[in-house]
Curated annotation (Swiss-Prot):
Belongs to the herpesviridae UL21 family. It comes from Equine herpesvirus 4 (strain 1942). This is Protein UL21 homolog. It comes from the Viruses.
C-alpha cells in the first residue's frame, strides 16, 4: 500500500529521530550492558 509508505516517509523528523535513538540505545544496552546517559540533543 503506497499511502502507508508515504505516510511513514512523511513522519516528522523528531519522531523518526526518537525511534532511531531508542533503537541505538536498546542495541547498545543489549550488546554492552553499559549504563547509558543521554547527553546528546
Amino acid at each position: 500500500n503506497v499511502s502507508l509508505i508515504t505516510a511513514f516517509d512523511n513522519l516528522d523528523l523528531s519522531r523518526k529521530g526518537a525511534y532511531y535513538l531508542y533503537y541505538l540505545l536498546s542495541e547498545r544496552l543489549k550488546r554492552g550492558g553499559v549504563p547509558v546517559h543521554v547527553n546528546r540533543a
